[in-house]
Structures are given as C-alpha cells and as structure tokens.
Amino acid sequence: MYEALKERFAEVFGTAPALLFSAPGRAELCGNHTDHQCGMILAASINLETVAAVRPVAEPRIRLLSEGYPMCEVDLQKLDPEEGEKESTTALIRGVAAGFAEKGVKPAGFDACVCSNVLAGSGLSSSAAFEILLGTIENHLTGAGLPAMELAKIGQMAENRYFGKPSGLLDQAASASGGVVYIDFAPGREPIAETIDINFEEYGYALVVIDSGADHAGLTDDYASIPKELHKVCGFFGKDVLREVDERLFYEKLPEVRAAAGDRAVLRAMHIYDENRRVHMARAALKCGDMETFLREVNGSGRSSQLLLQNIIPRKASDRQALSYALACAERLLEGEGGCRVHGGGFAGTIQAFVPLNRVDAFCAEMDRLLGAKSCHRLSIRPVGGVLLEVLE
C-alpha cells in the first residue's frame, strides 16, 4: 500500500512525496453513545489505517487526492464553514485547518495522496482516522506539538461544525491515542485518558468486526435523534448533558421526565447510566485480565443498545434489520461463549464479537456464508495513534 501511494503521489503532483503519515481506525469496546453525554468509554486503535503521502508547500492551500474521490483543494485563507461542502472530504480538511487556526497556529499548506483500508461506513471510524491523519500532518508541519486529545477535539469540531454530522469524542480520541484506552469525558475538566495493556488473543479470544452489509447513508437523523432526545431529559433538570443529572433524582422524577421527554428518551437515558457503570466494570476487568467479567459487560452493553438505546433498526426503514440479523447469527454461533454487541453508532455498519480462538475460523466462515464473503474482519490492537511513519527525503 505504501509504495503504491508514493507512486500515485508522483503521478498526480509531478514530484516525490517527502513524508508518510498514518492514523488508525478504532474499535469501540464498551460505552455505546456515552461520549456525547460526557460519560466514559473503552476503545482501541486497530491495525487498519489511513495513510497519506505528503509534501509541504509554501502556498496557503491544501490539495488532497483521496483514493476513489476527486481532488480536493482548500484555500487556507478561507476557513469559515461553507454550506455547500457539508458531508464532504473538503469540509473535513477545512475544518481541521480551522481548528489549528483557532488555537493560534497558522495551518500549513501541503499536497497529499491518501489511501485507506479502514472500511468506509463500517463503524471502524474511517472519518475519525482521516481527521486524525490531517491533524497529525498539520501538527508535524507547523511544529505545534498539540497532544493527542487536542487533535481529537479538532477532529470532532471539524466533523460537527464543518461536515455537519453530530459526533462525540470517542472516535477521534481512540484514533489519536493508540492502544486500548479508557477515557472519562466528565464535564468541567479535560478528559482523563488511561492506556490499558491487554492482548485479547493472549487470553484466548479474537476481536472480530462483522460488516452487516447495511451502510450509514441517509441515517444522520437517526444518529442525531439520540443526543436530541437525551437533551430533552437533561433540559428537564436544567442541565446540558446526562452526566450532570444525578441518577437517583432521574429515577425519582421518572414519571415527570417521561411526560416531558417521551418514552424513548427516558429509555435511552437509562442506557447511558447503565453503560457508564459497564465501562467502569469492563475497565477494571481488563486491568486484571478478568475476561469473564469483561465479556459479561460486553454482552450487557449489546443487550442495552438493542432494548434501551434502540440504535439497531433505522426509524424510517424498519424492514432494514441487517444489524439485528447479524447479531442473531453471531449469538447463535457463539453458543454462550465470548460476546457480541453493536459496534459504533449503530443503525447500520458493523457488529463486534469476541470469539474463542478455537472457534474463530469456523465462526468467520459461517458468518461470511450468512452475510456475504469478506464480512468478517479479524482485528488486532495498534499501540500508537496518528504518527509520522517515514521521512522520505
């Protein structure tokens, strides 16, 4: 992949690249939709990556060619959001550059060719990997030295404000940090991040992500409904995020909250409270190598996402139940061993399974038969986040 990318850069720009950068996709391990409520998450950088061959330029502009897309060009003297760029690669480029400018760092111009083996629309966060890749490039070219969490915040801002998709900080933080990471997004302070040294295969399990075959196109309203409804719950108590609402008070006032915010909103709030506890338990389990407890929390997370959070079936297409089908097939094949859950934002994309090593080949073969060839992707943990891979000259 690297050599082909260098050759492509030379073809497009008429000169050789000077630098090679990489940023990983991510796997969410526990903490489904807790990030945008200032909750806790467990996630991991994975061995799938987005890579850029880069050459800095003196002009205040970025030209970027991403595999399978037309050339993007951004004038770094025009960094305000542009309505016509919503949901485009150009919007993310402009947004990340603007994020550096907002921190008092003049963004650097460069030419880049980008390719990726992070599956788009898969729940492995190809967009976050791209944002962290851009942030890593700018961080190096400008010498800004911003820490990983600041790059994550810039990526989140670019996705929310410029791309136009509501996003918590989980995806970007996991891609930027590297390894298995626990992050507490408690309001009023900087996020607390803790890296956990764990190799799932040493404990007898493979981490597998399964593509359900349904993509995320047209589902922005479904995603947006989750923070929107939770905001109704928070608003009842005069708060901005659920982390600020005392759980005991929430249950004391449950009939009134239900009347004000609606049934689904309170069910989703119940999920958030429970899910934060699951993250806490899963983190403690991983730190002491207790896979039984960890997998219990993984399965609990999956059940809660289905029953309470309700991010499995798209609202406008109830006949599209690819995630439910994939989860049912995985649970049947696991026969009570390991664990499985929805992976990422939900409604489409992928599910995640922890599969005993002695069953993983048969599991993947049967899931591929049931969902389509190459649906299963066996992943490994990548220990680093966004990084300069190579200086080429």
What is the meaning of each model-derived region?
Residues 348-351:
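N-terminal pre-core extensions flanking Radical SAM catalytic domains
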Residues 1-26, 51-87, 182-341, 353-393:
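C-terminal nucleotide
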Residues 1-40, 74-80, 85-202, 334, ...:
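Gly/Ser-rich oxyanion-binding loop with an adjacent helix/lid
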Residues 39-58, 177:
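Structural signature of FAD isoalloxazine-binding scaffolds in flavoprotein oxidoreductases
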